Each structure stands twice: as structure tokens, then as C-alpha cells.
Amino acid sequence: MTTTTATLHDILELTGDVWRVRLKPLTEYPFIAGQYTELVIDGFSYLFFTIASDPSQAYVELHIQAGSDKSNSLIEHLQRQPSVQLNPAAGRCTLDSLTATDAPLLLIASGTGFAQIKAIAEDQLAKNSQRPLYIYWTSHSLSQLYMLEKAEQWAKQFDHIHTAALISEQSHWEDKHQMLINSILSDHQEHIASCQAVTCGSPEMVYAVLDSLVEKGFNAEQMISDVFDFSPREN
């Protein structure tokens, strides 16, 4: 597999112990909004991150949740050795995987799943699309909505973008995700059958949202998520 060399453009600590890392590929690095990359660094393995920038930008942006020994070591490594190898972009969670339509697009994320939402939203803006975008970003604390100001600014600046920040301190995942589901249905229950969705979060969250929306008439084939590939349901 051919890798691409990239250098560190900048690294910034955001709120919620999340770091924004922007890498500058030294040669062309093609990707589609919604795909992910893998960093190739000696001493590390399984460094998969969703690309948070859109393809029109000159760098590859990553959102890294620190706190674990592995992620903390990675941040320290990038600060010391600002050059990495990138495997080719991969992943099928892209809008070209869905039927072409101007119907509302639900962009649903928890935690650093916002990276995927950001890439897709910015790609739509770069293409001057007027398609309605409804962003639902959930977390158990406000600090973990680390780019909420950006998402809210989109909603202020563009009439076709709507942002909902959902904070739940519930520890049980069914209770935690019910607020998210209720918020989506309160906005779209009457026309949920025509909506499409991109869902970025844990398998429990993704499947809970999918099942609840399908019960109300949503077409399951119109939701995309990386979860469907890395954690598929058993038949």
C-alpha cells in the first residue's frame, strides 16, 4: 500500500480534551468528505481517524480524543516528530453512497464523531449546496462539544443549516440516546420517510437511532455510518 508523507501544519488543544491536528500532505492526497485515514507511525498501530476537513482544503484535519495512554503518546509524538505517513483514504460513509436528493440531511454525531459531520457540512458549503442540513451533536458534557461555536455559527449564517446541541448526563445508553431520538423526531416525524442520515457514534447509538427512526417510517437504506462496516449486526 502506497503511503503519503504529511507534515504537521498545526496542533491545537480544544475543549473536552480534544486536539485538532492539521497535516499538510506533501503530494496529492485524494479523499471524499466522510472518509477516514490511517496514520502510519513506528511504535503505534490502528491509528484510524475520520478526516474532519473537506477535500477543497489544503490540509487533512483530525480530531483526536486524548486521555488514554495511546492517544496521549500520539499527541506527544506529533509535537516532537511533525512528519507522518498516511495510508490512502478509505470508508463508504460518503454522500455518493446515498440516492441523490435535495431532501433534508440529518447529520447525527456524538463526541468526536463531529469530525465526519464537519467534513460533510463544509463540503456541502464549498459546493454552494442549499440542501437542508440538520446537525444533532450529543455528549454528556458541554465541554465535549468542542466546536459548538462553529456549528452554531453555520446555523446563524446559513438559513438551510440547523444545529442542535444535546447534553445528557445519563449513564445508561438507552436514556442517553432517547433525548437525541426525541429531538430528531420532533423536527422530522411528519416527513421522516424522505430524510437521509449520516450517523457517527458508538454502535449502540447508531443502531438505537436507526431502529427508532425506522419505526416512524424512515428508510434504513438512506442512513450511512462507518458502524455498518466495522460493527455489523449479526443476521
Feature locations, PLM:
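Short, conserved phosphate/pyrophosphate- and ester-handling motifs at nucleotide-, phospho-/glycolipid
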Residues: 34, 113, 202
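Ferredoxin-reductase
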Residues: 2-82, 141, 169
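Reductase modules of NAD(P)H-dependent flavoproteins
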Residues: 2, 71, 140-235
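Histidine-anchored nucleotide/phosphate-binding helix
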Residues: 114-126
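A structural signal for isolated positions on well-ordered beta-strands in alpha/beta enzyme cores
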Residues: 61, 85, 106, 132-136, ...
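Short, Lys/Arg- and Gly-enriched loop/turn segments at beta-strand edges
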Residues: 45-52, 91-99
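Phosphate- and divalent-cation-binding pockets in alpha/beta enzyme and binding domains
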Residues: 73, 116-119, 208-209
